[in-house]
Curated annotation (Swiss-Prot):
Specifically methylates the N7 position of guanine in position 527 of 16S rRNA. Coiled coil: none annotated. One of its GO terms (molecular function) is rRNA (guanine-N7-)-methyltransferase activity. HAMAP family: 16SrRNA_methyltr_G. It catalyses: guanosine(527) in 16S rRNA + S-adenosyl-L-methionine = N(7)-methylguanosine(527) in 16S rRNA + S-adenosyl-L-homocysteine. This is Ribosomal RNA small subunit methyltransferase G. It comes from Acinetobacter baylyi (strain ATCC 33305 / BD413 / ADP1). InterPro entries: rRNA_ssu_MeTfrase_G, SAM-dependent_MTases_sf.
Length: 212
């Protein structure tokens, strides 16, 4: 049995998730691959697998229940957070993981190939790249935990949005000032997240364009 199976199972249950043993196994395979590749390629600053479990896996899982359905784009996915976690837990959802860092995308492509995952692709490009905007099309949900600035994330997401698209931004503190600047154009729902074993403030912001 994987040394972190019980911890992941308990953590996911604390988040109100009922993940199958198969999905838990996939999540742990992902973490094992991340730990292995991280030794050579520096994919994440977090090196301790136990800390990775909390700050990457459980943190990403904490938004799962609140995400709307539909095709998903994860902008600045890095090593795959939260996009790969979502894809592994929701095989019926089509996911695109986007990052400009070649090493991180190589890792994700290799993992996708090794596990023969059908619902997720990793793309190396800059979010503002015109060709990528044309090729990838539009998405129902756009996630990120990479952007320091909410305004920057919204601007990056715009070309990939339908009128009904939900922007799902993972944040620590609530960026009240930035939300004020967006309030004429976007409705915003703020959801407080309780990540097991993480003593930090975490929030999910769900933004949707206000229809004129």
């Amino acid at each position: 049995m994987h040394p972190f199976l019980q911890e992941l199972k308990q953590g996911s249950q604390a988040l109100g998730l009922d993940l199958s043993d198969e999905v838990l196994g996939l999540l742990l395979k992902y973490q094992d691959a991340l730990v292995l590749w991280n030794k050579a390629y520096n994919l994440t600053a977090i090196r301790d697998p136990k800390e990775m479990l909390v700050k990457h896996l459980l943190d990403s899982l904490s938004i799962l229940k609140d995400l709307p359905q539909g095709r998903l784009l994860d902008v600045g996915t890095g090593g795959g957070m939260p996009g790969m976690i979502i894809a592994l837990c929701q095989p019926e959802r089509n996911c695109v993981l986007l990052d400009s860092n070649g090493k991180k995308i190589r890792f994700l492509k290799q993992f996708i190939a090794d596990l023969k995952l059908k619902n997720v692709v990793a793309v190396q490009t800059r979010v503002e790249n015109e060709e990528s905007i044309q090729e990838l099309g539009k998405f129902d949900v756009i996630t990120s935990r990479a952007f320091a600035s909410l305004l920057d994330f919204v601007d990056a997401a715009r070309p990939y949005m339908y009128e009904s698209t939900i922007i799902a931004a993972m944040k620590g503190l609530v960026p009240t000032e930035e939300m004020q600047q967006l309030k004429a154009e976007f409705s915003c729902q703020v959801i407080g997240l309780q990540v097991p074993r993480l003593d930090e403030q975490r929030h999910l912001l769900l933004l949707q364009q206000i229809k004129n």
